Swiss-Prot record:
Organism name: Cupriavidus pinatubonensis (strain JMP 134 / LMG 1197) (Cupriavidus necator (strain JMP 134))
Binding site for GTP: 230-235, 249-255, 274-277, 378-380
A Pfam cross-reference name: MMR_HSR1
Annotated binding of K(+), by residue: 230, 249, 251, 254
Protein name: tRNA modification GTPase MnmE
Amino acid sequence: MTAPLPPIAAIATAPGRGGIGVVRVSGPDVRPVMHAICGQALKPRHATYLPFLDGHGKVIDHGLALYFPGPNSYTGEEVLELQGHGGPVVMQMLLTRCLQAGHGIGLRLAEPGEFTRRAFLNDKLDLAQAEAVADLIEASTEAAARSAARSMEGEFSHAIHTLVEKVIHLRMLVEATLDFPEEEIDFLEASDARGQLATIRNDLGNVLAQARQGALLREGLSVVLAGQPNVGKSSLLNALAGAELAIVTPIAGTTRDRVKETIQIEGIPLHIIDTAGLRDEATDEVERIGIERTWDAIRRADIVLHLVDATDYLRHGLSEIDDAIDDRLSGQLPPGAPIVRVVNKIDVAPTVGGMMFSGNRPHVVAANGPNPTEIWISARTGSGIELLRKELLRLVGWQSGNEGTFLARERHLTALRQAQSHLDVAAEQSERQAQALDLFAEELRLAQEHLNSITGEFTSDDLLGTIFTRFCIGK
């Protein structure tokens, strides 16, 4: 039997001034703190308005006090919450008073995420739900918040548990066949083990697809605007953002450093990075540094929009400089990151080379082999901008109207991919003779381990520490 953890306390609301602030205390027995500060016993799960008292009986503040006996609380322990006025000085005075009153029972300041970690350790929520708490707090879009709420309610965990149950059932059949090889009944054949495995793999693929969508909502995409000077990169940033964020002038090289703005497209955060124009020779040291930073941003990009001038492109095709930029982009981008060629300023090139663009009829040329997708736009008039937004979503595989998405992290995607890989190997083993059954069983076991790591049923202490230290202190 493990010893109970020491009681902890922290300010649970965000730093700064506010109408209300909350100090939270959790532990095996918080009643000494309750009696010292509230001066009375509190009725469980009822808000009581009263004065909060210091060590000399003087009033620190008036507010609401709530007492939650364990295990029916957020952490599974006894919890005391003191809700007062949200000034930082008042909150600090109240927290200090809690620590003084709880000195005799070992009360200490909580570490980041420790309240939620205790909820996990006391089986109030699993690891995926615990992470969803932090994701809900940090959500930058409404879609991300709704998806985090679904994960917090257990939708993601339920999907994982369902997969694990199916894997366990299949493992049981394989183990029975291994343990009783002399039996006339072929457990695997009789129960359609291959069909069960195919179902599991299909279900896992669906969960992984949803998790990828959720990861997009959580992390967003880094989209870099690149190209020669004065091709309209800053104008495109302004058009995508719907605001004048970057300075736009006819003078080439106006943008000397990166300008970053986060926008939303169907709830996905897009981190748009406007960069210094790329050319063979920088005119000065400032521009040279700006160009270096442009390539640095490109190396970390999810998507690069390579802007070219419509008039020049229609008259002469891709210039040597733009061709060189394309070649270097291909070598500098992360594997799999797409390049979109954005042909800008079609409003000032309505009839060139026999091709006409009315200004409201942009078109897309789909990617073909090494050639990037082309989208024709006018950042100044807005023509083609909506088409560009849709193309960005298509490139990352976003499915519009996906209300069932749950939020996922990179570690979840990694675990799902690893489980998928083991199930793929298991499928290969199932096609072989009986001597491969032990390998089949081992691949199923490894797949189950990776799935269990998502909900925390098989997770190292080091990983738990990494996850919970990223929370705010009062959570």
